[in-house]
């Protein structure tokens, strides 16, 4: 998936799921399941419930995404 094809949205982490998956509520109210990007995993960036994150969504499946940034 090329970067141009993805949709980036802001959201809040609602719940932590097994295998570094998270339930994220987007700004528009939709709830998606998201996993951590490889660079965040590599640098041991922790994500907790309530964190504000940036999620990349693919236009093909809007129910799954990738967390690419955690706001401070």
Curated annotation (Swiss-Prot):
A Pfam family this chain is assigned to: eIF-1a
InterPro entries given in the database record: NA-bd_OB-fold (IPR012340), RNA-binding_domain_S1_IF1 (IPR006196), S1_domain (IPR003029), TIF_IF1 (IPR004368)
Family (UniProt): Belongs to the IF-1 family.
Entry's Gene Ontology molecular function annotations: ribosome binding; rRNA binding; translation initiation factor activity
Protein name listed in UniProt: Translation initiation factor IF-1
Claim: Protein biosynthesis is one of the keywords in the record: yes
Subunit and partners: Component of the 30S ribosomal translation pre-initiation complex which assembles on the 30S ribosome in the order IF-2 and IF-3, IF-1 and N-formylmethionyl-tRNA(fMet); mRNA recruitment can occur at any time during PIC assembly.
GO cellular component, one term: cytosol
Alphabetical list of PANTHER family matching this protein: TRANSLATION INITIATION FACTOR IF-1, CHLOROPLASTIC
Cellular compartment(s): Cytoplasm
Domain of life: Bacteria
Ranges for domain S1-like: 1-72
Gene label: infA
Organism encoding this protein: Idiomarina loihiensis (strain ATCC BAA-735 / DSM 15497 / L2-TR)
Biological role stated in the UniProt entry: One of the essential components for the initiation of protein synthesis. Stabilizes the binding of IF-2 and IF-3 on the 30S subunit to which N-formylmethionyl-tRNA(fMet) subsequently binds. Helps modulate mRNA selection, yielding the 30S pre-initiation complex (PIC). Upon addition of the 50S ribosomal subunit IF-1, IF-2 and IF-3 are released leaving the mature 70S translation initiation complex.
Main localisation: cytoplasm
Keywords annotated in UniProt: Cytoplasm, Initiation factor, Protein biosynthesis, RNA-binding, rRNA-binding
NCBIfam families documented for this protein: infA
Keyword Cytoplasm part of the UniProt annotation: yes
């Amino acid at each position: 998936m090329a970067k141009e094809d993805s949709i980036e949205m802001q959201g809040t982490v609602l719940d932590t799921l097994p295998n570094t998956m998270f339930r994220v509520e987007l700004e528009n109210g939709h709830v998606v399941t998201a996993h951590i990007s490889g660079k965040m995993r590599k640098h041991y960036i922790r994500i907790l419930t309530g964190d504000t994150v940036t999620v990349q969504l693919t236009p093909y499946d809007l129910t799954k995404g990738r967390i690419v940034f955690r706001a401070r």
